[in-house]
Amino acid sequence: MASTRTTIIKLIVPAGKATPTPPIGPALGARGLKSIDFCKEFNARTAGWMPNTPVPCKITVTPQRTFTFTIHTPPTSWLISKTLDLEKGSSSPLHDIKGQLSLKHIYEIAKLKSTDPSLQGIELLSLCKSVIGTAKSMGVKVVP
């Protein structure tokens, strides 16, 4: 029996590496969609991105078995990790400092995050504070 409501699926897919294997295939196939169509369009949209960048996307599935999707910016923690070339954050953030991040880096990450469709209308200062909070929770010291 077909659903009469729209469904939203949230996935994190590596840029340019979408394939109809799990987790994409089962998530879309259970809702009656051809996952290969999504994969082709997703890979085309993320072709210019750095390979293996985790790209969050929100897929909206209509009752007619059609879909639209929006691509969001990579997670803040991933951006910080790539900036500092870290494998992962600190397990005890206040005691084990993994690296230092300048305010210029914070500003650039916040500027990138401001292009995200879900963050439209949020002030850049608020985004900078959010990035600083994420950095501190990862054991990264913010220096001027």
UniProtKB/Swiss-Prot annotation:
It is found in: Mitochondrion; Cytoplasm. GO terms for molecular function: large ribosomal subunit rRNA binding; structural constituent of ribosome. InterPro entries: Ribosomal_uL11 (IPR000911), Ribosomal_uL11_bac-typ (IPR006519), Ribosomal_uL11_C (IPR020783), Ribosomal_uL11_C_sf (IPR036769), Ribosomal_uL11_N (IPR020784), Ribosomal_uL11_N_sf (IPR036796). GO terms for biological process: mitochondrial translation; translation. Keywords: Cytoplasm, Mitochondrion, Ribonucleoprotein, Ribosomal protein, Transit peptide. The keyword Ribonucleoprotein applies. Component of the mitochondrial large ribosomal subunit (mt-LSU). Mature yeast 74S mitochondrial ribosomes consist of a small (37S) and a large (54S) subunit. The 37S small subunit contains a 15S ribosomal RNA (15S mt-rRNA) and at least 32 different proteins. The 54S large subunit contains a 21S rRNA (21S mt-rRNA) and at least 45 different proteins. Component of the mitochondrial ribosome (mitoribosome), a dedicated translation machinery responsible for the synthesis of mitochondrial genome-encoded proteins, including at least some of the essential transmembrane subunits of the mitochondrial respiratory chain. The mitoribosomes are attached to the mitochondrial inner membrane and translation products are cotranslationally integrated into the membrane. This is Large ribosomal subunit protein uL11m. It comes from Schizosaccharomyces pombe (strain 972 / ATCC 24843). The lineage of its organism: Eukaryota, Fungi, Dikarya, Ascomycota, Taphrinomycotina.
